[in-house]
Curated annotation (Swiss-Prot):
Lineage: Eukaryota, Metazoa, Chordata, Craniata, Vertebrata
Glycosylation sites: N217, N258, N349
Disulfide topology: C209-C236, C213-C241, C224-C228
Encoding gene, per UniProt annotation: ism2
The protein's name: Isthmin-2
Gene3D superfamilies in the cross-refs: Thrombospondin type-1 (TSP1) repeat
Species the sequence originates in: Danio rerio
GO cellular component: a single term: extracellular region
Pfam family, one: AMOP
Length: 437
């Protein structure tokens, strides 16, 4: 009996110890009654909270009911190295077993570095959305993307991005002392390009004619930047040289009346020119007289140094005209009684290279006859001043200035039926002088 009681107490002790242990390990709820009889439930306290601080912080963070958004993962794209885009590697033989190519690729996984220049901070808006991890310090990582900056000058080595020495000075001035690669946007530094700041210089005056007689050239120039000079050239026609008075070697391919004898250099060259029966010339002259505009009856005052468009009633359309009274026209020799002249421009729809030539007196009235009248130009100076001289001026010289004989082949234009000018008595005097000359 005693043994049974003792065994029972041992069993009860074990059960009591087990129950106490379970009671201690089970979470305890504390209740507090309010005055209105409503029970308020406190938060459950876990005895493991003190031993795991990170779990407690997690509970406190999520107690607000707001879950943090997961950080977006950047899409990783494969890096493609295209040798065709790299000048120094374009001709490399990558098919051989050991190609002579050395490529350095640097990967930065560290946190963003402090940039020592304001270059990255002031990039344009296109770069503002990029993540901080994509920012590369220019001073520390200038060789990371070296193919993009071939012109970058290394102050220490004196070489550019390709490893070759820089021979020419950079045209850019930058107050930070470091050259800036192109295409990186605006910076705080005050940098300008010398070439675009310079104002375009004025043209110099025309140089004297390269010859003292006959046909020559004159030039003018202006600066277009460092080590650059722009030059323009134009022809200048002076008094024909003595050797040119009878020279007809390069005139239109005219044929003589008998079709066999070419132009000579004898005294009868004018007669040979007058008696030319070239079929080509006849067709060309007919086309010229048909297409060219009629001479205006008065000289337009606003045409000086300008190109004007004037309506031609006979052709029912407008033609462009320009002044032809400059010094190189030598009106004092070829049109002695004219004060000013006009020359029509080449037409886009025209089938010839000719131009109408009209001259005017002191009263700006068209000279329709006599020594000052203009005649059609078979070759416009707008197309070729050299050919114009040989085709339109040289025949006048061959006839020794006898305009009456010249006008028999190239009659002055008066298609608008302007008043005859000069008057009859003056015209007869000029005609007598020309024949006696």
């Amino acid at each position: 009996m005693l043994r049974a009681r003792k065994g029972l107490w041992v069993l009860l002790s074990v059960l009591l110890a087990f129950w106490i242990e379970r009671a201690i390990s089970f979470p305890v709820r504390h209740h507090k009654r309010s005055r209105n009889g409503v029970y308020v439930e406190n938060q459950v306290q876990n005895h493991l909270a003190d031993s795991h601080p990170h779990q407690r912080r997690w509970l406190q963070h999520h107690s607000t009911g707001v879950l943090p958004l997961p950080e977006p993962e950047e899409e990783s794209k494969p890096f493609v190295l295209d040798f065709k885009n790299l000048p120094d590697l374009a001709n490399a033989d990558i098919g051989s077993q050991n190609p002579n190519i050395q490529v350095t690729i640097e990967v930065l996984d560290d946190p963003p570095m402090d940039v020592e220049m304001d270059l990255v901070k002031e990039w344009s808006n296109d770069w503002s959305t990029s993540s901080p991890s994509s920012t590369v310090e220019w001073l520390g990582g200038k060789k990371l993307f070296w193919p993009l900056f071939w012109g970058y000058t290394d102050a220490d080595s004196g070489e550019d991005g390709t490893g070759q020495a820089e021979d020419e000075e950079d045209d850019y001035d930058y107050d930070s002392g470091e050259p800036i690669p192109s295409g990186l946007g605006k910076t705080d530094g005050d940098w300008t390009h010398n070439r675009y700041e310079e104002k375009e210089e004025e043209w110099s005056t025309w140089s004297p004619c390269s010859v003292t007689c006959g046909h020559g050239n004159q030039t003018r120039s202006r600066s277009c930047g460092d080590f650059c000079t722009s030059t323009e050239s134009q022809s200048c026609d002076l008094v024909p040289c003595p050797d040119d008075w009878n020279s007809v070697g390069h005139v239109f391919p005219f044929e003589m009346e008998n079709g066999t004898e070419p132009y000579g250099t004898d005294v009868g060259s004018c007669e040979k020119w007058l008696n030319c029966k070239s079929e080509f010339l006849q067709r060309y002259l007919q086309q010229v007289f048909t297409e060219l505009p009629n001479c205006p009856c008065s000289y337009p005052s606003h045409v000086s140094n300008n190109i004007v468009s004037l309506l031609d009633v006979g052709h029912e359309r407008s033609f462009q005209w320009r002044d032809a009274s400059g010094p190189k026209e030598r009106l004092d020799i070829y049109k002695p009684s004219a004060r000013s002249c006009l020359r029509s421009g080449l037409s886009k729809n025209g089938t010839t290279l000719a131009a109408q030539h009209c001259c005017y007196d002191d009263n700006k009235q068209l000279i329709t006859r006599g020594k000052g009248a203009g005649t059609p130009n078979l070759i416009s100076t707008e197309f070729s001043p050299e050919l114009h001289f040989k085709v339109d001026v040289l025949p006048w010289i061959l006839c020794k200035g006898d305009w009456s004989r010249f006008h028999a082949v190239r009659p002055p234009n008066n298609g608008l039926h302007c008043m005859e000018n000069p008057q009859q008595d003056i015209f007869m005097n000029e005609l007598e002088e020309a024949r006696e000359y």
